[in-house]
């Protein structure tokens, strides 16, 4: 492969390349695997960096272990707010989340914010709750959670926030990722964080989405002008998350006890509000979208999209590239409609890897039957819904090969897709979801941006998921590109290049 001015200039055999470009600087990759670089279609950059530089609770194996990690971190960091992330009580023997009393008993009168792994609920120390004006005992979900998180974030210095962003983007580059879709909004990090991130200099490209509701085309134009966002989409919340029991469901949570105040989860936007936003964005020619997980939330968004199509027509809606984040509970009928309207599904296969299956968190929250219908990648792809894959980091790690593997090994038979389709969703599909629709970005062909990663991989194959029909030839003479075997030993990133510039390695 020859690269000139950040663009792929030529591909072919080694001897022809050396003859055609005799004065080129030659890098011998010594058998390494080169592929288009990844794009993560859903991240929270500052929060990811804070998880990397702060207290990481994702490895906690019990409530006691979680509190031990908190105690040790507090001792090592005696000043400032404690920012922690990643606890998941569903994997603990106690099956009990940490409480404010637990936090106070562990660290005393310090400010501490500890978000659950899905970042849709949290626990905080009493001093932080009081600073945020949250009553004792009130659950930290929805607006209360956003208020506590905002107060905790305000305790961080500009230097700490910048350090966190650099750590997050460095981690992306080290994972073979050259671009991320930042899903920001007034409830996520606020405008200050948004503007600081946009001003942050790094080799990883940040494509920003701003999740704030608008009601008219004029409001959409104004908000795009003020934020310079790629679209008014991303984490504009229709509902919450299944782990926190805040995703909006038609039927109650299977494990909702009598103390559960909202057994059907939470609805943050109704059909009329969703329709108003989509109509405003469509009229303005702007990408709109939402965070949508529960089946009731998907029903509401589908109804709103139907109303938007009825008003503006299918082609006008399709031109905008509206996108839905997560889209975990979708029916066959809904998938067909979304495909016909060109709606993009920005999904996270590692959600199924972590929480799917008959003994997983999804089954605990929903029961086995409903849980088996989550994250239906094959259904959506079969109905023409464009897929874009990401991590929702810090909810899951930015590990794109693990993402590809998860999409091919879905817990539910019939929901997996091939490795090649999953790879496309994590590269070309994610570029397309970000508004880049030239047909070549995310590939390595002459004229495409030279954005690629170099990997050490132990073995290669061309394979379909075990429950899918083979859709391309495995004969080497067909010259179909192979992919690394996605066993326990995933490929290791040696170098990442974006538009011809080395950003890692």
Model-derived regions: residue spans:
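Long hydrophobic segments that form regular secondary structure
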Residues: 267-308, 433-456
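Short acidic/histidine-rich active-site segments
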Residues: 286-295, 346-349, 380-402, 447
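Phosphate/diphosphate-binding loops
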Residues: 200-235, 321-328, 332, 359-385
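Divalent metal-coordination and catalytic microenvironments
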Residues: 6, 31, 42, 66, ...
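Glycine-enriched alpha-helix->loop->beta-strand junction motifs that scaffold or abut catalytic
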Residues: 227-230, 306-308, 338-346, 383-386, ...
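Histidine/acidic-residue-rich catalytic or RNA/ligand-binding cores of hydrolases
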Residues: 126, 190-193, 298-306, 355-362, ...
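Divalent metal-binding segments
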Residues: 2-218, 243-297, 321, 368, ...
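C-terminal cap of metal-dependent C-N hydrolases
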Residues: 405, 412-413, 418-428, 432, ...
């Amino acid at each position: 492969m020859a690269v000139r001015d950040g663009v792929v200039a030529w591909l072919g055999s080694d001897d022809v390349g050396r003859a055609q470009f005799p004065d080129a600087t030659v890098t011998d990759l010594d058998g390494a695997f080169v592929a288009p670089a990844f794009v993560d279609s859903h991240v929270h950059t500052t929060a990811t960096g804070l998880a990397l530089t702060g207290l990481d609770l994702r490895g906690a194996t019990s409530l006691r272990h979680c509190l031990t990690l908190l105690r040790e971190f507090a001792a090592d960091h005696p000043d400032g707010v404690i920012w922690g992330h990643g606890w998941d009580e569903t994997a603990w023997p106690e099956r009990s989340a940490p409480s404010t009393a637990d936090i106070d008993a562990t660290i005393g009168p310090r400010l501490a914010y500890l978000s659950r792994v899905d970042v849709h609920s949290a626990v905080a120390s009493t001093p932080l709750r009081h600073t945020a004006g949250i009553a004792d005992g009130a659950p930290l979900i929805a607006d209360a959670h956003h208020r506590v998180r905002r107060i905790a974030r305000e305790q961080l210095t500009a230097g700490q926030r910048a350090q966190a962003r650099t750590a997050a983007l460095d981690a992306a580059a080290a994972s073979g990722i050259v671009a991320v879709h930042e899903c920001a909004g007034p409830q996520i990090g606020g405008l200050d964080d948004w503007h600081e991130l946009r001003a942050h200099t790094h080799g990883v490209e940040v494509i920003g989405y701003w999740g704030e509701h608008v009601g008219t085309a004029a409001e959409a134009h104004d908000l795009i002008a003020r934020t310079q966002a790629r679209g008014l989409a991303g984490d504009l919340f229709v509902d919450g998350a299944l782990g926190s029991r805040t995703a909006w469901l038609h039927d109650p949570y299977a494990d909702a006890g009598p103390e559960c105040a909202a057994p059907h989860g939470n609805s943050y936007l109704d059909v009329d509000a969703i329709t108003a936003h989509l109509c405003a964005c469509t009229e303005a020619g702007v990408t709109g979208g939402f965070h949508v997980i529960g089946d009731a939330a998907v029903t509401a968004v589908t109804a709103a999209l139907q109303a938007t199509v009825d008003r503006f027509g299918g082609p006008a809606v399709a031109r905008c590239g509206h996108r839905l984040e997560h889209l975990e509970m979708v029916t066959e009928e809904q998938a067909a409609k979304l495909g016909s309207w060109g709606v993009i599904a920005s999904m996270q296969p590692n959600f199924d890897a972590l929480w799917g299956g008959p003994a997983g968190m999804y089954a605990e929250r929903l029961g086995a039957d409903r849980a088996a219908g989550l994250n239906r990648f094959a259904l959506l792809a079969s109905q023409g819904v464009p897929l874009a894959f990401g991590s929702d980091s810090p909810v899951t790690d930015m590990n794109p090969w693990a993402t590809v593997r998860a999409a091919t090994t879905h817990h539910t038979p019939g929901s997996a897709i091939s490795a090649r389709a999953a790879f496309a969703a994590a590269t070309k599909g994610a570029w397309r979801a970000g508004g880049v629709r030239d047909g070549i970005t995310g590939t390595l062909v002459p004229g495409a941006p030279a954005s690629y990663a170099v990997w050490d991989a132990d073995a290669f194959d061309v394979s379909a998921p075990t429950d899918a029909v083979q859709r391309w030839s495995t004969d080497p003479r067909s010259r179909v590109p192979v992919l690394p075997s996605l066993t326990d030993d995933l490929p290791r990133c040696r170098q990442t290049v974006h538009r011809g510039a080395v950003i890692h390695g």
